[in-house]
Regions:
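Short, charged/polar surface micro-motifs in flexible loops or helix N-caps
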Residues: 33-35, 44-48, 67-69, 114-115
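Short, well-ordered turn and helix-capping elements at secondary-structure junctions
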Residues: 7, 27-32, 46-48, 74, ...
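A short, N-terminal "cap"/entry segment at the start of jelly-roll beta-barrel domains
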Residues: 1-37, 117-141
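Ligand-binding loop in jelly-roll beta-barrel domains
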Residues: 69, 76-77, 81-82, 90-117
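Short glycine/proline-enriched turns and hinge-like loops at secondary-structure junctions
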Residues: 36, 54-56, 98-100
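A short beta-strand-loop-beta hairpin characteristic of the jelly-roll/cupin
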Residues: 49, 54-82, 92
Length: 141
């Protein structure tokens, strides 16, 4: 058994080539081979978001705090709240991040395939993000 104590792992800023705005990533766990699962706590400050990306074996997001948005390529923008669990299937192009007026923290869980857990694409532009209604309005649609 291995216990990783809270606060014992170093966090880092989300790289600007993959994120817009201030993002903090705290690795939580990474299994040893033959396991390939890893997880991190990711906090997006208000207005921060990930670029479009895919995961070769999918991704699960567990929203822990705040309010955010998630969208699959070509799909509607969905509001996400604490307790929501988002399942992104393998290869689904998507993005996620905070609303303009609230930070959002989620736990991200994904598996490695051939040494990769994510394939990054273009950033979610400010023009698209500015057109998003508030989380309350998205919830009502």
């Amino acid at each position: 058994m291995d216990i990783k104590r809270s606060g014992s792992r170093s966090s880092s800023e989300g790289p600007t080539e993959w994120f817009t705005g201030k993002v903090r990533i705290e690795p939580l766990f990474r299994t040893s081979a033959p396991g390939r699962v890893q997880g991190a706590s990711v906090t997006f400050e208000p207005g921060a978001r990930a670029a479009w990306h895919t995961h070769p074996l999918g991704q699960t997001l567990i929203v822990m705090a705040g309010r955010g948005f998630v969208q699959s390529w070509g799909g509607p923008i969905e509001a996400i709240h604490p307790g929501d669990v988002v399942s992104c299937p393998p290869g689904e192009n998507h993005w996620h991040g905070a609303t303009r007026d609230s930070a959002m923290t989620h736990i991200a869980i994904q598996e490695e395939l051939d040494g990769k857990v994510v394939n990054w694409m273009e950033k979610v532009g400010d023009d698209l993000y500015r057109r998003i209604r508030s989380a309350k309005e998205v919830d009502r649609s």
